[in-house]
Each structure stands twice: as structure tokens, then as C-alpha cells.
């Protein structure tokens, strides 16, 4: 399979979606990743069904006070125009002007001051292959 530019491009010969392995598949509650309120941030796009599923589970488990949420703009944009054509979820600083107000999207990520989810992944794990994450 050729290197992918987004999770949507991970399709096998039969047209089925095949997710690549991720560096971010650890379990919260382990010694390395203790379950501590405020330690983690859930990033979501309300346009992404996978992300909306995580919001539903967070609510069903009553974790709203434990895991804060940051919402990104509901459309993809080029994440590093000077470097490559990768498109992914972005914050208001890089989004269409009307996207941020409708969904209370912050200008930048509150943790890393990043302007895209790709930049958040790269800040958390500098060696991450951005093509293999839904960014």
C-alpha cells in the first residue's frame, strides 16, 4: 500500500477500509497512563462519526468532569501548506471563518497551541507518521 495522506485513503483492493496500526493505542489505567482527572484531552470534530462516538461513551460513562473536550472545525484543511498536501482537522486559526463561531472552536489547541490535530500529534510524539492517524 502506498503512503496515505489521510485515514480515508486506507482502502484495500476490495474497497474495504483498513486502519493502519497506531502509536496511540495504549490503555488508560495502566502504570504508564494512569487514570487521573485532567491528564487527558479528547479532541473531536463534530463532523466525524468516530469522534462523536467517543463523546457518547464519555457521556454514558459520566466522564464529563474527568476528560475535557476540545472541538476542531468541521472541515478539513491543508495542515502544512509549505510542506505537503496533507489535509486534516484544524482549529479556527486555519479554518473557514464561519466554522469557528458555529461550534465554539478555539483559535488554537489549548494544550500545545497547535493549529491542527496533526500538529497536536507531532507535539505529543515527534516521530509520529501523520499519514497514519486521522488528523
Where are these regions (language model features)?
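N-terminal regions that are enriched for targeting/export leaders
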Residues: 1-40
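N-terminal start-of-chain detector that recognizes signal peptides
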Residues: 14-15, 41-43, 104-111
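A short linear-motif detector with a strong N-terminal bias
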Residues: 20-22, 48-49, 115
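A generic structural signal for solvent-exposed, polar alpha-helical segments
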Residues: 23, 30, 56, 95-97, ...
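Local sequence-structure signature of Cys/Sec-based thiol-disulfide redox active-site neighborhoods
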Residues: 28-80, 86-90
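Thioredoxin-like thiol-disulfide oxidoreductase module
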Residues: 78-128
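A short, hydrophobic beta-strand/beta-hairpin element that forms part of a small beta-sheet core
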Residues: 132-135
Amino acid at each position: 500500500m502506498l503512503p496515505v495522506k489521510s485515514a480515508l485513503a486506507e482502502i484495500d483492493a476490495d474497497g474495504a477500509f483498513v486502519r493502519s496500526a497506531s502509536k496511540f493505542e495504549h490503555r488508560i489505567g495502566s502504570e504508564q497512563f494512569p487514570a487521573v482527572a485532567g491528564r487527558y484531552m479528547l479532541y473531536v470534530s463534530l463532523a466525524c462519526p468516530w469522534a462523536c462516538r467517543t463523546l457518547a461513551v464519555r457521556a454514558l460513562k459520566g466522564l464529563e468532569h474527568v476528560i475535557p473536550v476540545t472541538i476542531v472545525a468541521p472541515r478539513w484543511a491543508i495542515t502544512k501548506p509549505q510542506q505537503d498536501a496533507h489535509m486534516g482537522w484544524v482549529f479556527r486559526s486555519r479554518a473557514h471563518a464561519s466554522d469557528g463561531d458555529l461550534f465554539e472552536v478555539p483559535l488554537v489547541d489549548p494544550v500545545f497551541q497547535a493549529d491542527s490535530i496533526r500538529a497536536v500529534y507531532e507535539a505529543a510524539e515527534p516521530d509520529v507518521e501523520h499519514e497514519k492517524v486521522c488528523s
